[in-house]
A protein has these predicted regions:
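Metallo-beta-lactamase
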Residues: 84-95, 99-111, 126-184, 230-246
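Metal-dependent catalytic neighborhoods of phosphoester/phosphodiester hydrolases
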Residues: 79-80, 114-124, 261-262
């Protein structure tokens, strides 16, 4: 499954790695009435008792380079058996994984970087330079840090640290690819990045990962955030910027293909798909 589109003059494509089955809503969106969460999900046409999300990987053709942003779960099935489709969908779209020049990571959680390495220990994108935040690499590269979750730490050891010589760290506001600027958006992880793309779009990563709950309840502490209070503040900053600057949203976990915009709605926000 893939979807071609343009961001200004930049050719883009969304490529699916397939859906994930996450925890029950009240276990993720903390401090929100479970009944309110269920009602919001039902109103959105989603199942009320489980968080189901997509994995929409962005491919850009920019400045003679082919850049892939995040790469899904790989072959791991801890969030269900329907993920791990990225490589097959790339080939269906006519994209050879060996043609990827830049592998760009919003952060190092399982569903964003476990497609980096194959089960045999060889890179799935053998010619790619890996770009990620310096703060993210420092955080996950520090063994024994009690703030790390064990599953993500194991994944970093398998998928990223063996390729350390290919990793280039990037900083907030750095334009590291033609038409692409990094935006440090901490909270979900210490070095989480969003990306601003010339032509008026923002790849938001996991700052506001769920449509509609992240928009209706931006102040809710998220169980997946390393620093939940920082995550709340970052989410408010991001959502206000998306609205004020009228940026198009590229949502990694949003309903396929994850494209739309954000508007203010009552005392919170809402995502308008396809706009």
């Amino acid at each position: 499954m893939f979807h071609r589109f343009m961001i200004g003059d930049i050719a883009a494509m969304m490529i699916s790695d397939g859906p994930l089955r996450l925890a029950r809503p009240h276990r993720i969106f903390q401090s929100v009435d479970p009944a309110a969460l269920a009602d919001a999900l039902t109103h959105a046409g989603q199942v009320p008792d489980r968080i189901l999300v997509e994995q929409n990987c962005l491919l850009l053709e920019t400045g003679g380079k082919r850049a892939l942003f995040d790469n899904g779960m790989g072959t791991d099935t801890m969030f269900g058996t329907e993920s791990g489709r990225l490589l097959a969908n790339m080939r269906e779209a006519g994209v050879d994984p060996a043609s990827i020049d830049a592998l760009v990571l919003t952060h190092a959680h399982s569903d964003h970087c476990w497609g980096t390495m194959g089960d045999d220990g060889t890179p799935n994108f053998p010619n790619a330079t890996i770009y990620m935040a310096e703060a993210e690499l420092d955080f996950w590269g520090e063994a024994g840090n009690p703030a790390q979750d064990e599953i993500s730490q194991r994944g970093v050891q398998k998928h990223l640290l063996p390729l350390r010589e290919r990793i280039v760290t990037i900083r907030d506001r750095q334009s590291f690819l033609p038409g692409v600027q990094a935006w440090l958006t901490p909270g979900h992880t210490p070095g989480h990045l969003a990306f601003l793309i010339d032509g008026g779009a923002c790849l938001t990563g996991d700052v506001a990962f769920h449509d509609p709950l992240s928009y209706l309840y931006p102040e809710a502490r998220c169980a997946y955030d390393t620093e939940p209070e920082v995550g709340v503040e970052t989410r408010r900053i991001m959502l206000n910027r998306l609205v004020d600057e009228r940026l198009g949203v590229i949502g990694y976990h949003h309903p396929w293909p994850g494209l739309g915009r954000v508007e203010r709605f009552r005392d919170s926000y809402r995502f308008i798909a396809g706009a």
